[in-house]
Amino acid sequence: MTVGKSSKMLQHIDYRMRCILQDGRIFIGTFKAFDKHMNLILCDCDEFRKIKPKNSKQAEREEKRVLGLVLLRGENLVSMTVEGPPPKDTGIARVPLAGAAGGPGIGRAAGRGIPAGVPMPQAPAGLAGPVRGVGGPSQQVMTPQGRGTVAAAAAAATASIAGAPTQYPPGRGGPPPPMGRGAPPPGMMGPPPGMRPPMGPPMGIPPGRGTPMGMPPPGMRPPPPGMRGPPPPGMRPPRP
């Protein structure tokens, strides 16, 4: 049901209302809500009913019952009257308004972690990181340079690397000497000055293998003087 703001029912919200039912019972409570069927919700409600005596000589007595929250059916409702103004909300906590003046308290964060007054612990000297600005690249490296400057620096670095002699660590000697064709092996004396070194075996014959031409293999007697040895394989002997 659509209810306008000027409805009388809305004007009596939160009032203390007296509701009389068909059976004569009276409900007095704080009016909170209603609907199109006139079903009512009363808060802090009390019920009053009259009890008839058994004898006619005795007067009627009224009985009170504390009910609390009550839902009244509209079909049993006879009348509604105002019992009193809305009660004052004393002792009920409300959210303070944005423009309200602040109290004497001080707003602080919840107590978690380390208090604000306690100094932060410092790391040991050996485990602390580098100081800001120390240990990074030099200022010349970080300064932006043009294309020509970068190319010249790269060329100079390449030339210095190509022309610089190789540095050997101390205590390990210099580079090995160049091995010539006639250089003697380590531990042997070379030929005197002015003489050519002896020639080694030919490149095709490995040293220590094979025998010179005309020499019999080991274990065989040489032929007698005036006789030739056997012809090499694949050749016919000469005719007499």
From Swiss-Prot:
Asymmetric dimethylarginine PTM sites in chain numbering: 108, 112
Keyword annotations: Cytoplasm, Disease variant, Intellectual disability, Methylation, mRNA processing, mRNA splicing, Nucleus, Repeat, Ribonucleoprotein, RNA-binding, Spliceosome
Record-linked Gene3D superfamilies: 2.30.30.100
Post-translation changes: Methylated by PRMT5. Arg-108 and Arg-112 are dimethylated, probably to asymmetric dimethylarginine.
A single cellular component GO annotation: cytosol
Stretch list, region Disordered: 163-240
Chain positions with Dimethylated arginine modification: 108, 112
Residues modified to Omega-N-methylarginine: 108, 112, 147, 172
Subcellular location: Cytoplasm, Cytosol; Nucleus
Domain of life: Eukaryota
GO molecular function, one term: histone pre-mRNA DCP binding
A Pfam family matched in the record: LSM
Chain segments carrying region Repeat-rich region: 175-236
Biological process, per Gene Ontology: 7-methylguanosine cap hypermethylation; mRNA splicing, via spliceosome; protein methylation; RNA splicing; spliceosomal snRNP assembly; U2-type prespliceosome assembly
Similarity annotation: Belongs to the snRNP SmB/SmN family.
Disease per record: Cerebrocostomandibular syndrome: A syndrome characterized by severe micrognathia, rib defects ranging from a few dorsal rib segments to complete absence of ossification, and intellectual disability.
Function field: Plays a role in pre-mRNA splicing as a core component of the spliceosomal U1, U2, U4 and U5 small nuclear ribonucleoproteins (snRNPs), the building blocks of the spliceosome. Component of both the pre-catalytic spliceosome B complex and activated spliceosome C complexes. As a component of the minor spliceosome, involved in the splicing of U12-type introns in pre-mRNAs. As part of the U7 snRNP it is involved in histone pre-mRNA 3'-end processing.
Protein name, as recorded: Small nuclear ribonucleoprotein-associated proteins B and B'
